């Protein structure tokens, strides 16, 4: 198995990316990596050589500030575009990048290509829950506007991922809404609710945002605008809560003593709520796995994104999505 990696994408690239690659090579004997980026820079950060790591030179980089579509069209020799081409031309089975999210979605859609029958791809991270099991949220920004039929496909794709990668035999699929009652919400959610009831997924109804971290469902579907707001609210809230805890536990001598006693448990809680432990955000609906690692990814986060991409390839997620979407259309 070979995964192409954008070595130049992300706030901590290329060092964090390369360190994450080295960690994954040590962990998985079947994994081969193509590092795409400036060859001289990459080789200067490689701590050791491996016959399972190949470097593909790219003399351009898509910056975070670049307009996504224009950048993909104009920067043909960028690390991200060449990475996607490795997958499109069957030299790699999957790809990951911590770079420009919009550009990666554009490259995935127009270079890697969309699965036949998929109307709109969806960007889907796995987010933490109190239990530590996590839940899949899609879409978080691939499409800010969506139709009910799109959300139904999100439910199917998310269900496949949860079953094949997370090992959940019958994933619970919930619809993010302002209330749990069937008739709650706007036209989009009301129509989506009716359609999801008719599918083969294990649809458990509407789910309110306040219940997400309690594990109300394994897969949560929503439009990209709502999903992105939800994602950033959860991220921001978690960071603020940990900051408040830190400020409180360092405010006096007595609280500092308490902090010393509580530190192992606090670190355990922080690790449980760290979304990077679950990998990156997958772009579902494409012919091969495309994974977006967080822009601030360190080596550990890159490793988990690679682990996730490897699992998606091993479990034939794209093929299962194509088959189940086809079956659903046949049943209509």
Swiss-Prot record:
EC number: 2.3.1.274
InterPro entries named in the record: FA_synthesis, Phospholipid_synth_PlsX-like
Keyword Transferase recorded: yes
Transmembrane annotation, as ranges: none
Cystines in this chain: none
Subcellular location: Cytoplasm
GO terms, molecular function: phosphate:acyl-[acyl carrier protein] acyltransferase activity
Biological processes per GO annotation: fatty acid biosynthetic process; phospholipid biosynthetic process
Keyword Membrane: no
GO cellular component: cytoplasm
Catalytic activity annotation: a fatty acyl-[ACP] + phosphate = an acyl phosphate + holo-[ACP]
Keywords in alphabetical order: Cytoplasm, Lipid biosynthesis, Lipid metabolism, Phospholipid biosynthesis, Phospholipid metabolism, Transferase
Pathway(s) it belongs to: Lipid metabolism; phospholipid metabolism
Top enzyme class: transferase
Subunit structure as annotated in this protein's UniProt entry: Homodimer. Probably interacts with PlsY.
Protein task: Catalyzes the reversible formation of acyl-phosphate (acyl-PO(4)) from acyl-[acyl-carrier-protein] (acyl-ACP). This enzyme utilizes acyl-ACP as fatty acyl donor, but not acyl-CoA.
NCBIfam families reported for this sequence: plsX
Family: Belongs to the PlsX family.
Name of this protein: Phosphate acyltransferase
Organism: Bacillus velezensis (strain DSM 23117 / BGSC 10A6 / LMG 26770 / FZB42) (Bacillus amyloliquefaciens subsp. plantarum)
